Amino acid sequence: MYCIVCLANEAYAQHVAVMLTSLFYQNPQKSFRIFLMTNTMTENTKKKLIHVVESHGELFFLEDDYNNLGIAMLKSETSTKSWNPIMYLKLLIPQKLPVDLERFLFLDVDMIINHDIDELYNTNLDGYILAACDDYKYQQAHRDRLGLKEKDEYINSGVMVIDLKAWREKEKQYQMINFLENNKELLNNDQDGFALYFRGEIKLLPNKWNVTTFYFEQTPRILDKYLSEVNELRSHPYIIHFCEPIKPWFTDCKHPYQYLYKKYLKQTPWSDYKFPFFISPLSVKFWKSELKYWLNRCGIRKDSMNLISLK
């Protein structure tokens, strides 16, 4: 039985369905226990998600309205930063999951699973508490801001294999909520919290397990030692992470794998979804963006931030 943990509110329920549908498609012979942490979700939406999961395992809703005192305080004190409120629920994972659960795979919901997850789920943690991929885009800036050393990992927390038993043992010494409360002046998002709290206890995963939108930029600014990987990551991403503002559920998304989101969406109870625009097509900003995109596509302009198209 494969245990998956994810977070979503009512607004992101559709995207949970798409991500899980892709997971089940790529892993047809597996059974899953899905733990969905949420703060707001209607009964009708829950029924739709149960329908998505029922042929592949069990779905458990772990609900919380931030009534945990530590969460409430941290939420109040970091409200001006870039924390998405639903992300606070990550901090409650050790308390919310069943006591008999020792390992799980955490997945963000703005993803498409594009490969069998056996290798990922059964990662040898080698004594580390969690395994995840580097977050390259602003990695050095994050390290400098948080006071991390070169050997300390700054990860993208969208895909994590976690030894829950070891995390709970660590919590007995110093609860993550209390740790973050005492370091709140440093924190801009939940990834900062994971980097600091699990400092020295993180194993890096191969980048194929969390191929972020960053890798599809015209000239991604990553470490030279990883440049040789870029073409392979673009052509054969095992997990595609749509982690930029213009997500694949917007008409004006230019991500080359948006079509996979549309493919799996058709297999969910949200198949009649009408794609809105992220930027209004009536705005000057929209047409400037379109012009820049097509100038890049035609080779007239070279903008490092422009997303490539796959041939």
Q: Which residue ranges define each predicted feature?
A:
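A glycosyltransferase accessory/donor-loop signature
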Residues: 1-2, 8, 18, 169-311
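Short, acidic, metal-binding catalytic loop of nucleotide-sugar glycosyltransferases
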Residues: 22-31
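Short internal beta-strands
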Residues: 33-40, 132-134
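Short, aromatic/basic amphipathic alpha-helical patches
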Residues: 44-56, 254
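Active-site-proximal specificity loops/subdomain of glycosyltransferases
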Residues: 52-95
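GT-A fold catalytic core of metal-dependent nucleotide-sugar glycosyltransferases
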Residues: 66-69, 86-138, 152-154, 159-162
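A short, conserved beta-to-alpha structural element at the edge of catalytic cores
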Residues: 130-150, 254-257, 270
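Conserved nucleotide-sugar donor-binding
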Residues: 159-171
